[in-house]
């Protein structure tokens, strides 16, 4: 914990996320090949240089929801930062236990990142990347509904990830209750990733996912930063334009009644019907809606 405090004090850390699992390979943990453990990486992570670094699929500091929340509160007290969790979704017992333990308001996570099974990596067995963990929409909805039913959804910041860098997917995520979305592969594609699936070999041909200095020379920071920025600006523009089309100032104000899911060419159902939401779920509190509208107005967005 002393090392964690030192890192937090030495860098602009905004929050701490405890990774429980990853949508692309839930239940597998991780392995950083020794070829990618450079002197810099070894120093940062406190591991031997050039040696495979295996991260287990389970944490040693806790073994259930109760002990996890004790650990979350301990880290929050020691660092003064928001502490949350990231997880793929499968068996719902964990989430039921989490809600039950948070209802009292005594302990809880500050944010939850739901990572859909669509989450990407170039270093996972195909069976896991294709067929393990719920897709984002199903997994997120199942988690959010449990918090909404318990009346504590406003106490948690919900974050979505898993192919949400595409504007149509992001809009659905916001409507389902996500307060923000994480973007990974789309940013990587914007700076040159060709999905060669060599991330774990340290031989990424475009230099995007490698610690090999010779290969990394292929990345021009000036050019690539402009391309990444253009992607982010375009995504933001599209999200705001769709929001305007729905009559609201911000994508976070789009509701599950605003969106329909088409079933073939002959029928449709609202997002609320498809995911069994009650009216009013998925949107910020009234106070937050007022604050969001005011914030958008100060940045030149007229009220819808």
Where are these regions (language model features)?
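Glycine-rich phosphate/ribose-binding loops and adjacent secondary-structure elements
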Residues: 59-216
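Short loop/turn motifs at secondary-structure junctions
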Residues: 12-14, 107-108, 177, 247
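Short coil/turn segments at secondary-structure junctions
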Residues: 52-59, 127, 219-226
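Residue-level signal for well-ordered alpha-helical segments
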Residues: 18, 36, 45, 49-52, ...
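Alpha-helix initiation/capping motif
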Residues: 1-6, 27, 36-38, 91, ...
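Alpha/beta catalytic cores of nucleotide-metabolism and tRNA/nucleoside-modifying enzymes
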Residues: 131, 142-155, 165-304
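Active-site-facing alpha/beta catalytic cores
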Residues: 1-99
């Amino acid at each position: 914990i002393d090392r964690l405090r030192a890192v937090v004090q030495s860098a602009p850390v905004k929050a701490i996320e405890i990774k429980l699992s990853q949508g692309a390979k839930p239940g597998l943990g991780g392995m950083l090949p020794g070829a990618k453990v450079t002197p810099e990486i070894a120093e940062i992570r406190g591991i031997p240089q050039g040696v495979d670094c295996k991260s287990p699929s389970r944490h040693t500091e806790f073994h259930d929801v109760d002990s996890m929340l004790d650990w979350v509160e301990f880290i929050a007290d020691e660092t003064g930062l928001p502490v949350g969790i990231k997880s793929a979704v499968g068996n719902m017992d964990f989430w039921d236990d989490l809600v039950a333990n948070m209802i009292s308001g005594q302990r809880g996570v500050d944010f939850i990142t739901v990572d859909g099974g669509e989450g990407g990596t170039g270093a996972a067995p195909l069976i896991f990347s294709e067929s393990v963990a719920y897709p984002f929409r199903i997994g997120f909805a199942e988690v959010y509904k449990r918090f909404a039913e318990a009346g504590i959804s406003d106490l948690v910041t919900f974050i979505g990830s898993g192919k949400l860098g595409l504007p149509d997917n992001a809009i659905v995520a916001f409507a389902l209750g996500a307060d923000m979305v994480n973007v990974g592969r789309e940013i990587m594609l914007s700076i040159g990733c060709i999905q060669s699936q060599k991330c774990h070999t340290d031989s990424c041909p475009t230099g995007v996912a490698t610690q090999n200095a010779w290969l990394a020379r292929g990345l021009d920071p000036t050019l690539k930063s402009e391309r990444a920025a253009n992607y982010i600006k375009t995504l933001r523009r599209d999200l705001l334009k769709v929001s305007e089309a729905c009559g609201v100032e911000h994508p976070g104000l789009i509701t599950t009644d605003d969106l329909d899911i088409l079933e073939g060419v002959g029928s449709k159902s609202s997002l609320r019907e498809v995911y069994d939401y009650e009216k009013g779920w998925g949107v910020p509190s009234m106070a937050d809606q007022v604050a969001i509208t005011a914030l958008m107005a100060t940045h030149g967005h007229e009220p819808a």
